Amino acid sequence: MRVFLRIWLLLPGRLRLSTYNKLLEFGRRLYRHGRSAEVHRLPFGLYLRHGSGLDSTRNEFNALKLVRQHTSVPVPEPLDLIGLPPYPNDPFKEDHAYLLTTRLPGTPLAYCEDMLSDRDFEHVAAQMKDYLAQLRTIPKTVNPDMAICNVSGECCIDPRLSGWNPVGPFPDEAAFSQLMRFPDDPARRGHKIVFSHGDLNPRNILVDRFVRPDGSRGWRVTGIVDWETAGFYPRVLGLYESDVRGIPVDQAIQQAGENNFQCTRRLLKGAAN
């Protein structure tokens, strides 16, 4: 497989692109709907993301390689990245890209959270706590002059702060905090800068059934996907990742203690500490 991939990547991008488009057409008929309008399941255990901007797609490609290199966090393997010129009707004239990855088993947690018991949530939260700890150990080797940046040391794309508009990079947390409400709050200083997924929420966490040692069935994390916003951020911001709408951390943790659990807050309580 590795030898074939090396040979395949030597072929012209136009030929590879044509093949991916044919697989995309076949996959749409075979699997109907993907996780989003931009992400599609293909035959042969593959997924294809297309239509996203080249910069964010390249960032995801590099993030996946980085996570696979430094951690045991289950993420897709990035196989190919092809950059393309802007669509003719794109008013922003932004380059876009095709990203080919392997497929991970499982279903987004957001689609099956009602099937998980309290015991299942405890297990999933424990896994996520371990994975987040591993991600925070990934070394930053890019752009030493800018502490807060994407995987390549360039602009960040953070839907929590600026929609999908690129911002930064930033030399320190004080400069980064100017994007937020109350930017001069002393609480927005002194946090460790760590590697972060950037958009971690139940839609991007895959879970699947498994058999426990005692013979009972439960749920476990089988993958984390959608890494296009990954980068190096203040650690405190990672607490918001479990809710892309940016509910304050103290409020989220308080809500996690109520009987009427919501999936996001249950995970945040167990995994974000």
Which role does the model predict for each range below?
Residues 1-36:
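Juxta-kinase regulatory segment immediately upstream of eukaryotic protein kinase catalytic domains
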Residues 28-151, 155-158:
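ATP-binding pocket architecture of kinase catalytic cores
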Residues 57-61, 125-128, 132, 202, ...:
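A structural signal for well-ordered alpha-helical scaffolds and beta->alpha junctions
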Residues 60, 197-199, 204, 226:
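Acidic active-site catalytic centers that drive phospho-/nucleotidyl reactions
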Residues 63-65, 203-209:
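Short, well-ordered amphipathic alpha-helices
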Residues 83-89, 121-128, 134-199, 208-219:
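An alpha-helical support segment within catalytic cores of ATP-dependent transferases
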Residues 106, 203, 230:
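Active-site loop signature of alpha/beta-hydrolase-fold enzymes
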Residues 194-195, 208-273:
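Active-site Asp-x-Gly
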